[in-house]
Amino acid sequence: MSKGIRRMTVHDAAGVHAVELESFATPWTLDAFEAEMTQNPNAYYVVADQDGIVGFAGLWHIADEGHITNIAVKQSHRGKGLGEDLLTALIAVGRALGLRAMTLEVRVSNTPARTLYEKLGFQYVGVRKRYYQDNNEDAAIYWLELEGEDL
């Protein structure tokens, strides 16, 4: 991993949860992140500075596909390329695992995230109607094909 990105440990859970609370209307619980560390210990990554965790990203490995569960950067650190660095790291992990493709959902209104996903090669493939529970917003579905790419 580059630019200070490293695998998440159970000791990072509180810092990751703080970023999650700041970033999402329906955040995961601290218990959920701690459970991820025991059930999925190799698929969450963080970036930190001297003050602690400033961003994180997660990946579920399901058969030959990867599902990006969440990616977030503290508001004070947005616009510095950390989200792109985290997503690029997850793509590298997916390739190392031999995944065929990666997918994610994002709020249709989240233009900055959608722009980033498209910049990194993700293709819009559809919509999940009323996906987000807080306001029934639709989710845009994106896929990135890894199979056949030059690794």
Show which residues each predicted segment covers.
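Acetyl-CoA-dependent GNAT
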Residues: K3-S76, L87-A89, V93, L97, ...
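Active-site acidic-Proline motif in GNAT/NAT acetyltransferases
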Residues: K74-S76, K80, V108-N110
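Conserved GNAT acetyl-CoA-binding A-motif
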Residues: G94-E105, R128
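Conserved catalytic-core motifs of GNAT/GCN5-like acyltransferases
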Residues: E105, E118, Q123-A140
